[in-house]
Structures are given as C-alpha cells and as structure tokens.
Amino acid sequence: MIKVKVPGTTANMGPGFDSFGMALDIYNEITVEEIESGFEMLQEGELSEIPLAENLIYTTFLNTLNKHNYKYKGFRINLSKCDVPMSRGLGSSATCIVGGIFAANSIMGNVMSFDEIIKEAVSIEGHPDNVVPAIVGGMTVSIMDKDNVIYSNVTVPDRLRAFVMIPNYKLGTEEARGVLPDSYTREECVFNISRAAMLVNVMNNGEIEKLRLCMQDKIHQKYRGALIRNIDDIFKKAYEFGSLAEFISGSGSTLIAFIDKDNNEFYDRMKNFLDTLEDEWTVHLLKPNFTGAEIIKNR
C-alpha cells in the first residue's frame, strides 16, 4: 500500500498572478492498494459528486502508468484524508494531480525524475502556480519557457502565518477567469510588476511590515472580489485586527490574511466577526509547508 500526502496551496498571492504560490500545512492524502483486477475508486463527500472519468486522482494515476507502459492487475484508490476543499482556491486539483503522479511513480519504482514530475503535473493543471509548491514545498515563483517549467524558491519569514477563511460556497476557476479583462493598461502592468518584484525581496529579507504594500494588485483581485460576498468588510476587519496583508487565495472563494505569529488575539476576533455574516466560514491558522508532497507509507 502506498500513501501520498500532498499540501494545499495558495496561489497568486496578490500581484503574482499565475506565478506565485505557497504550500500550507493543510493536506489531502491518497492511498493506493494493488488488487487482483480492475479499478476501485473510493469516493466520499464532495468527491462522490464527480464521475470517475473526471476524477483527477484516477485519471492522472492511470494515465501516468499507461504513459510508461507499466503492466498492472488492478488498484484500489482512496482519498483517505480530504482537508483541502474543492473549488475554493486552495489547490485541490493540484493535490489530486500531484498525488496521482506521486503514487504512480512510486509503484513504478520511481522511474520519473523530479523535473519530469513537475512538467507532467503542470501540463495537466495548465499553470504552475499551485502544482510547483505542492511538489517542492515553501513559496515558489514559477514561469513557463515553452514547455519547460522554471521555478525558484522564496524564503518565507519564520514569523509569518496564514489565517485562512473558507466560505461555504464554491468559486470555480473558469468562472473566476471569466470576469477578468482581455487587456490591461501599461500603468496596471507596471503596478503589478513592481509589487511582485518587491514582494520576493521583502519575503527573502523577512520585512513582513512591508507586505501590505507589496501584495497590492490591479490584475485580478478587484474583478474576482465582486464574486465573494462581504470581501471588503472582511478585509477591513482583518486590517483592524492587525493583519499584515489580505488577499484572495487562488481564484477564490477562500480569503487569506497574513499575520504575525505573535498576534495572539487575531484568530478569535476574526472568527467572531465572520460568525456574524450570512455565509458560514471555516477558518484555519496555518504555517507554510516546506516539505511538499511526500510518500508517507510504502509497503
């Protein structure tokens, strides 16, 4: 039996649209067992709503085996732990893709190199900002050079924590991309480029007091924010309670506030405020994950 543990991720992180991502200590775990014949996919909760042919764990796992002409009898696949919610902007699809590839590669005797795993995962996901940190951990900046994925790790300050706010409604990537404009002004592009560059340096230097300025954005958040109820009030309260910066996680609907680990009152104060809103919000106070995806059982 093989068990793969994959962290959820937050992507974009303000100005880093489709490029920046960070792994968080919230996880999905996938268990794979060999059986005599056929495929069994144990699907529970939100996953049970997805047809097998559209299940990213199943399709990625099977396609990876077939691509390498691996001969097999059958497998039972189970999403044995599902803490990363679907379609909420925390990289749920990346956990499924990465988990499927890692499980298949382990079964095949680790025939794929690290770079091959990353390239395959990005080709399925379509963009690198979630899958790269899910694989390597930490904060990453990723770019595409034709079919090649180039990434670099960014140092995350020890004091940084992510207060994650997950509403009880989904926001699909397709819908969230659909509200974005087809073009941007030069001023808007320069605004984001300068802040994205500054954000990397601020992270590397541990200058968390500068995060608010660096995480401003004019490319996607003002458009997607219209799809998330009470976002302005939530961000205003987070600022009032001492947040370092607030942003939409991925394409939404999850919101994140970066806080200093010593801000001991933030969790309770923010949760109490969210409880007054009409939607139900699940909250987590998370550290960055620095290990990325890993095989935690192989026997």
UniProtKB/Swiss-Prot annotation:
Family per record: Belongs to the GHMP kinase family. Homoserine kinase subfamily.
Identification of the protein by name: Homoserine kinase
Keywords, sorted A to Z: Amino-acid biosynthesis, ATP-binding, Cytoplasm, Kinase, Nucleotide-binding, Threonine biosynthesis, Transferase
Subcellular location: Cytoplasm
The organism's place on the tree of life at top rank: Bacteria
Chief location bin: cytoplasm
EC number, UniProt record: 2.7.1.39
Biological source species: Clostridium novyi (strain NT)
BP GO annotations: threonine biosynthetic process
Binding site for ATP: P85, M86, S87, R88, G89, L90, G91, S92, S93, A94, T95
Record's function text: Catalyzes the ATP-dependent phosphorylation of L-homoserine to L-homoserine phosphate.
Alphabetized InterPro entries for the sequence: GHMP_kinase_C_dom, GHMP_kinase_C_sf, GHMP_kinase_N_dom, GHMP_knse_ATP-bd_CS, Homoserine_kinase, Ribosomal_Su5_D2-typ_SF, Ribsml_uS5_D2-typ_fold_subgr
Top-level EC class as recorded in UniProt: transferase
Any one GO molecular-function label of the UniProt entry: homoserine kinase activity
Pathway info: Amino-acid biosynthesis; L-threonine biosynthesis; L-threonine from L-aspartate: step 4/5
Catalysed reaction equations from the record: L-homoserine + ATP = O-phospho-L-homoserine + ADP + H(+)
Cellular component aspect of the GO annotation: cytoplasm
Lineage, highest ranks first: Bacteria, Bacillati, Bacillota, Clostridia, Eubacteriales
Pfam families in the record: GHMP_kinases_C, GHMP_kinases_N
